[in-house]
Amino acid sequence: MAASVEHRPFTSHQHGVVRSFKSYPDVPRPKKLPLPQPLSDSTNDNDEEAAVWKELVLKSSAGVEPSIFDPRDDGTSDQWIKRNASMIRLTGKHPFNAEPPLPRLMQHGFITPSPIHYVRSHGPVPHARWEDWTVEVTGLVTRPTCFTMEQLVNDFPSHEFPATLVCAGNRRKEQNMVKQSIGFNWGAGGVSTSVWRGVSLRSLLKRCGIYSRAKGALHVCFEGAEDLPGGGGSNYGTSLMREVALDPSRDIILAYMQNGELLSPDHGFPVRMIIPGFIGGRMVKWLKRIVVSNQQSQSHYHYKDNKLFPSHVDAELANEEDWWYKPEYIINEVNINSVITTPSHQEILPINSWTTQMPYSMRGYAYSGGGRKVTRVEVTLDGGETWQVCSVERLEKPNKYGKYWCWCFWSLEVEVLDILGAKEIAVRAWDEAQNTQPEKLIWNTMGMINNCWFRVKTNVCKPKKGEIGIVFEHPTQPGNQSGGWMAREKQLEKSSESNPILKKSVSSPFMNTATKSYSLSEVRRHNNRDSAWIIVNGHVYDCTRFLKDHPGGEDSILLNAGTDCTEEFEAIHSDKAKKMLEDYRIGELMTTDYTSDSSSSNNSVHGNSETTHLAPIREVALNPREKIPCKLLSKTSISHDVRLLRFALPAEDQVMGLPVGNHVFLCATVDEKLCMRAYTPTSSVDEVGFFDLVVKVYFKGVHPNFPNGGIMSQHLDSLPIGSVVDVKGPLGHIEYTGRGNFLVHGKPRFAKRLTMLAGGTGITPIYQVVQAILKDPEDRTEMYVVYANRTEDDILLKEELDEWAKKHDRLKVWYVLQANIREGWEYSVGFITESILREHVPLASPDTLALTCGPPPMIQFAVQPNLEKLGYDIQNDLLVF
């Protein structure tokens, strides 16, 4: 077997809830693991692969909390088994059928630790002793034999390789949301990957002298040890066709080790079948007998489980017409499937100047059966009209017959604004046989092998502090857990059926039939919060009533109010947004008096006044409703990935006109697509004729989560001197007006002390406020800056901040670094913690506000909870740029 995996970093995870436990005797197991000697024909490649697998197993199991005696097993026949408390039980207390939470499954990466590997059991786990266990091979063989475990380990070459196991019911709950099947509610976590070691089934059968096909040896049947009620009492059993069982390319083994350890009780100790590329239901656990026969297994479970019937066949019809015994409906090989794991269910993506700087990385898994390679994975944001091809991380090599047994991981970088305009995200995969996933769910009575497009719905939300965000919703949640868009829509359907008025409103969308025409000059007058009109493709829309609900905030509309914004709207909005826009159409643009936006607009700060009768007022460059062209004057490399860019304003005597705390959009066409990113200038707002930007360049191929790097930052870095970029603004909901006063969403706030927490490039709006305060000698506002970065080289504007802190007592600056700490570093190491904040920022008080800008995880997991511990009301006293 030539399967192999490559190095992959594994992230930590949240521990499950540890419950109190009782003491029960452990199952008797040998003191020493049955580690076979290296094969005589082993190669250095095999040794290297084994070392890689060992490393992967160790990394994947790091941080897994000890299994416990779960109180839910009290009083059951499984009360002697320790289990991981995080596993989601799907069939109540007993029998134990469980899957891990999907985020937990993915956090461990390619190899799934045994304690969180999904479990499928039909009854109680048999008690087993290694020393006493035998596997009988009988039936149509010349040498029937009972093998002990020691014989299986020592008398046969061992085979070890990674393989993905999938329950045929994976994603069944989606089917149950449409119509209840006869199966329980698997989520998308009924899949796991482990490194398995065992004895080749082919070698075992040949050792026992399997008869020829001509002598009737057509099927190889497997029987487990558990006593089950099905069929009036039986063991779990199933079978393979002879050709499959003897096929050397299929790597079928009797496995006795999982991830370098003996099998656990839930996974078949001491020995089980592993049939790569087949559904888990064919892999008999607690294996006791192998019978070569002229007919397939006669087990009740072979016939009454793991079948895929046509959609019209329900359980009653299947029983009446004996569909269970029709061989064409048996499920053997796994089908093609893929799932979105990031974004996770109920994950919130804030929309702000930080999150729009970099694309969002979507992730998930994909697999196929029969050894077929997953050749591509695609994601759509527009219901399948267009598809984007994902990057696929394939961590195994094929075996010598070219077969793949493991899942792969896919990722795709998506612009945040594209997600904002999407109604849903869907994924599909393809394999080398050109199999792909159907768009729509195909219901069947057992709820088996559901593999329709995995869809994640997007909804606009308003997280804390009134920000706009996107909340993601998976179709279902496993077991009896509530949640998921399918459950919500099902409930809405029930409500509409019971309420004729609601049903009519749901099924009869509003149709706007306005045909009135407006002149451009009339549209231009509607350019404020009280009346915000826009022009898109010659149509006039009144967006006033949508201001408060717009996902990007009202400023995004007000920037364009009174103008023709066709280009910008088309660049960043999806088909969903375009359809929504129709509800706000009030008429058409008259073409008879059309002139260009700039020809008749008055951009002067004096408006239509006679300027000769007014005191001199310096011209402001920014116009919220227009892009202004700005030429690149200079470019200075501060470090290997940080640039100081100076841009000229359109006129030498202009100031930028950017309120302190606001930002601007830089607009450029990159690869024939409009790209817009938010930046906060570091130059003083009263500089005349220019503005400065400090830009961190995210290069391609440097950050594993963003292999393509930053589109805009790389574009800016590549610009030659003299190039022109378009700038639009101002934009932002926080404005510092001086001497402790703020306007937040237009409402006044005041503070004598400011707690200022920044991460990475999020320092720029903090820096802007600090700069404004220090320029005013009468502004006595106290500032306490805590600035977190990964390494010292990542700290932006450190010289300026340190110099200001030396000169001004009202500014305190403290740094936190995560890695590459030099000797003599005098600041904090690690992450922003409660103790760091207690030492370096003021406690909460009525005249203290907190300001923050940085990566969303920093704000969510470090800033917000630790400020709360200091007494801050993060709903009201934390301002997020």
UniProtKB/Swiss-Prot annotation:
CDD domains: cyt_b5_reduct_like, eukary_NR_Moco. It catalyses: nitrite + NAD(+) + H2O = nitrate + NADH + H(+). Residues 625-737 form the FAD-binding FR-type domain. Its EC number is 1.7.1.1. Keywords: Disulfide bond, FAD, Flavoprotein, Heme, Iron, Metal-binding, Molybdenum, NAD, Nitrate assimilation, Oxidoreductase. Coiled coil: none annotated. Its cofactor is FAD; heme; Mo-molybdopterin. Pfam families: Cyt-b5 (PF00173), FAD_binding_6 (PF00970), Mo-co_dimer (PF03404), NAD_binding_1 (PF00175), Oxidored_molyb (PF00174). It is an enzyme of class 1 (oxidoreductase). Mo-molybdopterin binds at residue 167. Residues 1-46 are annotated as: Disordered. GO terms for molecular function: FAD binding; heme binding; molybdenum ion binding; molybdopterin cofactor binding; nitrate reductase (NADH) activity; nitrate reductase (NADPH) activity; sulfite oxidase activity. One of its GO terms (biological process) is nitric oxide biosynthetic process. PANTHER family: SULFITE OXIDASE, MITOCHONDRIAL (PTHR19372:SF7), SULFITE REDUCTASE (PTHR19372). This is Nitrate reductase [NADH] 1. It comes from Phaseolus vulgaris. The lineage of its organism: Eukaryota, Viridiplantae, Streptophyta, Embryophyta, Tracheophyta.
